[in-house]
Amino acid sequence: MSTPTMAAPGAPVVDLDLAELRRDPYPAYAALRRTAPVAWVPSVGRHLLTRYEDIAHAEKTPEVFSSREQGSLLLRTVGPNLLREDGPQHRRLRTAAEPPTRPRQVRDLWAGAFEKNAHDLLERIAGRGEADLIADFAEPLAAVNLALVLGLRNATADDVADWSRAMMTANGNYADDPDVWLRAERATRAIEEAVAEIAEAVRTEPDGSVISSMVHADIALSEIQNNVKVVIGGGVNEPRDVFGVGARALLHRPDVRDRVLGEPALWKRVFEETARWVSPIGMYPRQLLKDHEIGGVTLPAGSRVALVIASGNRDESVFERADTFDIDRPHRAHLAFGGGPHFCMGAWVARHEVSALAWPLVFGRLKNLRHDGSAADRMEGWVFRGLTSLHVTWQAA
């Protein structure tokens, strides 16, 4: 199957600056939804799908919009993996890896340790009266919890966080920066060594982890290693970034914060609205297996497309006042965790970690918590998006 390297007939060509997208992609996405919902973007080398309806359709038709994109950045970074498989091969890997991340397993196996990890991290900073909640809390919490669920007891939280940054930067390396590939290669080797050691240990002593589950489903070591790399990538940035974006929103909306503190059931709404408002994963690549018309454009077989989740989640035809953070908006399923057979495997882990533990603990424990407006906190990214830091102050005991 050949891969077209130019716009499909009838598709508008739109030049987008990647640096500007990293800074703030939403104005460009709004313009695309209005005037060019299926557009060829030369700087990305693919057609961008930016409307909710088209993205949802593509996610539900893997027989047309295949995850098995030839030469994808993810394949280059980690090798063959379940995110780039469809059909029986995807089901085989997902069935082996998913059980430890299901809601019941999260509650029964991991919730107690997650809570202890959150308390331990908060205890380290509680007496300081100031912190960067990303570097000092959200990222190490996501990393230590991920190591637990994966079974990587031979890796520290710092190891997992460093590996995740290397994987995610490479997965979004559309600029083809050689230094990015070098860091990813180093992380890849380290992950493979750690996984091989644990896989051997759990063969005789199962521990309920993802690696253990895959070993006892007779998945080959190389496949386990590749899929652990994938999970390490998304398993840190998604809970970290949802935590940071939602925390900052609440710090600037004390009325909402006070409501949620008084009615803890609302934390779930805060999570879903945060994931919609600033999606931690902004796009998914796909490749067409056959000619297909979508958004008024017939895309030929082989075409590479981007399902721009971050844009679909701001589609005004679906979400009224879509650019506004609003936990009271009428329920409509967002796209932040994907859909169809590729629905995010770690969604329930992230939901519990952030909405049941991290936010309630931070906002309940740190009195008079305020955003430090003098700090240079910024939001960045378009393939993946989140806060680089979140500096806060509070009244230390």
Residue ranges and their predicted role:
Residues M1-A397:
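Cytochrome P450
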